[in-house]
Amino acid sequence: LYLRFPLSLRLVEEMLLERGVVVSYETVRRWALKFGPAYARRLRRKTPSRRDIWHLDEVVVTIAGQKHWLWRAVDQDGYVLDEVVQTRRNTAAAKRLLRRLLRKQGCPPRRMITDKLGSYAAAQRQVMPTVEHRSHKGLKGLSNRAENSHLPLRRREPVTQGFRSPRYLQRFVSVFSAVRNLFVPSHSGRSASATHLHRLNAMAEWKVAANVAA
């Protein structure tokens, strides 16, 4: 529940109590930290090949009063490819994200779409010089796919009352995005019935990954 829905630890505690399971919210937190990474690894092993357009964006996150940046890449379906918490919003930070992406994806994309931040262009020229790069400067909405990918995390922030450290945030998004990716339809523009079927299949896969009895 905590990994899938924007629920606080205390709300999960109350929902479990309603089902006859008596645990504290602190126990729920420990469960998420202990089992979440294993669930994410199982889900990633079944991840299909992603598509060939990368949308990149960065969003500011305040941790213990200090400004940090969460750099994220998604494909054209909105599937999160990778994300990394960094203290800088510069070329070095952009290069780190691109290198992580190349290592994890195994090959460069056909096209890379970003906002107008100059660090992306500088990093692209050094790390992926043959990849087509488009900036949405003057092309309103071109990078909305990446910008919209921040919304699920933004909805979680008030519930979690902030993140206690960069390491905690990195661990959280690693698991949170792996779970969320499972429920993202593979192609845009699906019918309602196809989307419903996708969700049923995703829930079945989630139960297998989490070792939940049917």
Regions from the PLM with identified roles:
Residues 9-21:
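DNA-recognition alpha helix
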Residues 30, 34, 83-106:
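Active-site beta-loop-alpha junctions of metal-dependent nucleic acid enzymes
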Residues 50-63:
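Two-metal-ion RNase H-like nuclease active-site motif
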Residues 116-174, 184-185, 189:
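Helix-centered, glycine/charged polyanion-binding patches within enzymatic domains
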Residues 3-6, 64-80, 98:
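Short conserved beta-strand segments at catalytic cores or DNA/RNA-binding microdomains
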Residues 159-161, 170-214:
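C-terminal domain-tail junction helix/linker
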Residues 12, 28, 57, 73, ...:
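Mobile genetic element proteins and their domesticated derivatives, centered on retroelements
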Residues 7, 22, 30-52:
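Short, basic alpha-helical nucleic acid-contact segments in DNA-binding proteins
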